[in-house]
Design a protein with these regions (language model features):
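Extended ligand-binding regions for polar small-molecule ligands
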Residues: 84, 164, 168-190
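Beta-alpha-beta core module
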Residues: 45, 52-58, 62-64, 124-173
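Short hydrophobic/charged patches on amphipathic alpha-helices used for structural packing
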Residues: 23-27, 57, 83, 126-127
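Secondary-structure junction motif
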Residues: 39, 43, 83, 87-112, ...
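Hydrophobic hinge/microswitch elements
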Residues: 18, 27-32, 37, 96-153
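Flexible hinge/capping segments at coil-to-helix
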Residues: 49-91
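Central regulatory/effector-binding core of bacterial HTH transcription factors
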Residues: 1-45
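Short helix-loop capping/hinge motifs at secondary-structure junctions, enriched
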Residues: 72-81, 159-161, 172-178
C-alpha cells in the first residue's frame, strides 16, 4: 500500500496492539481504523464496547481457526490438528495486560486450558518462539509468505468455532484514501 502512493513524503503508523488498545485508538482518533475479530465468545462484549465508543464493525471475512507453527514442526505435515494434538507444545498468545478477560483475547480458543503458555506483545517474538520452541498460536489462517517467509505455516484446527475478521471505524466517518487502500489490499490478500 505504501509503495502504491509513491509520494515524496508520508507518515504512516502501523500498530500491533492489544484488543482494548485497538478500540481506544480508533475511538480517540489515534488510528483511522483497526482490525479485530468477533467470535461467539467475545461478540457481545466487543459489540457493546464498540457501541459505547461510537464505532462500527464491518466484517471482511469469516474463517475457521487454524494454527501457525514452524514449517519443521512435528505436526506440520498434517491436514488438520486437534487441541489434543497440541497439548505437548507451548501455546503462544498475545498479552492483554490489565484487560485479562478472555473476551479480549486474541486467540479463539482462549478458554481451553493448556499446560504450557507463553504470552507476547508482538508477532515477531511469537514467530521466533514458534520456530525456536515448536510453539503454536491459533489464528485465522491468513499468512503472507511474502512478508513472513516460508518458516511459518498454517494448519486447520479441528474445532467447531469460527472467527469473523473485520475492521472497526468511527461512526459516520469516511476513510482517507490511504485507509481505503489498506482495506482494499487486505481484501485482495484474502
Amino acid at each position: 500500500v505504501i509503495r502504491e502512493f509513491d509520494a515524496a513524503r508520508y507518515d504512516f503508523t502501523l500498530r500491533e496492539e492489544q484488543t482494548h488498545e485497538i478500540i481506544e485508538d480508533v475511538a480517540h482518533m489515534k488510528s483511522e481504523l483497526g482490525i479485530l475479530y468477533l467470535s461467539e465468545h467475545n461478540r457481545e462484549v466487543i459489540e457493546r464496547m464498540l457501541a459505547a465508543n461510537e464505532l462500527v464493525f464491518e466484517g471482511l471475512f469469516c474463517a475457521t481457526p487454524h494454527v501457525f507453527v514452524c514449517a519443521d514442526h512435528p505436526l506440520a505435515g498434517r491436514s488438520s490438528v486437534t487441541l489434543e494434538d497440541l497439548e505437548d507444545y507451548p501455546f503462544l498468545s498475545y498479552e492483554q495486560g490489565s484487560y485479562n478477560s478472555f473476551y479480549y483475547s486474541e486467540e479463539l480458543t482462549s478458554t481451553f486450558e493448556r499446560r504450557k503458555n507463553i504470552r507476547v506483545r508482538d508477532r515477531a517474538t511469537l514467530f521466533n518462539l514458534a520456530m525456536g520452541l515448536n510453539g503454536y498460536t491459533v489464528c485465522s489462517g491468513v499468512i503472507s509468505h511474502e512478508l513472513n517467509g516460508p518458516g511459518i505455516i498454517s494448519i486447520p484446527l479441528d474445532v467447531d468455532e469460527y472467527m469473523e475478521i473485520g475492521i472497526i471505524t468511527r461512526k459516520n466517518t469516511t476513510l482517507t484514501r490511504y485507509g481505503q487502500a489498506y482495506i482494499d489490499a487486505i481484501r485482495q490478500h484474502i
